[in-house]
Amino acid sequence: METDTLLLWVLLLWVPGSTGDIVLTQSPASLAVSLGQRATISCRASKSVNTYGNSFMZWYZZKPGZPPKLLIYRASNLZSGIPARFSGSGSRTBFTLTIBPVZABDVATYFCZZSBZBPWTFGSGTKLEIKR
């Protein structure tokens, strides 16, 4: 999937916490992690987002005043230019975004998104902060 096409769809359909046929439950809502430690964010779909052997789950990072940035596509594939500190895993209904180690620049809100069925839907977001 080309990044430009995906970004256009995301910008057109960006409705955090929206609901459709598939509901995404993201947790935790907020997370404070020390620099250098691991952050783990979970996303559970109300039904499987697997089709033809692919898991249609994406992860985005959003910072104030910036468009969402694609980190992970199809559950575990790292988008070009994204550091290997970011990784995705999971299948069917249960997915995880891991950031290890966390850096100061990772302060943001992270969203899961399913692209298996129209309308594409998003989780409600996880706000990552640095523990002082």
From Swiss-Prot:
Q: Which UniProt keywords apply?
A: Adaptive immunity, Bence-Jones protein, Disulfide bond, Immunity, Immunoglobulin, Signal
Keyword Membrane assigned: no
Q: What are its GO cellular component terms?
A: immunoglobulin complex
Region of interest called Framework-4, as start-end residue ranges on this chain = 122-131
Show the disulfide pairing.
C43-C112
Quick one: where's region Complementarity-determining-2? 74-80
| SUPFAM superfamilies found in the cross-reference section | Immunoglobulin
Question: Looking at the keywords, is Signal present?
Answer: yes
Ranges for region Framework-3: 81-112
Transmembrane segments in this chain: where? none
Residue span of region Complementarity-determining-3: 113-121
Q: Which residues form the signal peptide?
A: 1-20
Miscellaneous note of the record = The partial sequence of the C region of this Bence-Jones protein was also determined. It differs from that reported for mouse MOPC 21 only in the transposition of two nearby residues.
Q: What name is this protein filed under?
A: Ig kappa chain V-III region MOPC 321
